[in-house]
Amino acid sequence: MSYLNREQIKTLIKSGQIYSNKSIDKNQIQPASLDLTLSDKCYRIKASFIPNNIKISNVIKELSLSRVNLNINTLLEKNCIYLCELNEKLKLPKDIMGKSNPKSTTGRLDIFTRVITENGKEYDSIKYNYKGKLY
């Protein structure tokens, strides 16, 4: 496995293979990664899950306890599970896949994060040729 460098990530952004609800800030692009950002679509849910062959929109309907407004100063409750759509979306080519891991800041703040995809079979793994949203 090899990693994309900053210039390769920029090329994917320029070509629309990585795109966002908001413009991608140049500071999000790191030497060998892209910092992902939360959208305003966030839900407190009953349990964590791996999508497998289930649409995430259906899981939201089944597991959602409440919608969380991230447009205001919001305090996320301790020991609760939240599902947030990320601003960034992907149209990966067949020869590129992705791996995600939290920034060290989230660990220092005692926040546990995972990334999931539609029909994903494991946390923090984005399959080759994936097209869709990230959560």
Residue ranges of model-derived segments:
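Non-catalytic terminal segments and appended small domains
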Residues: 1-135
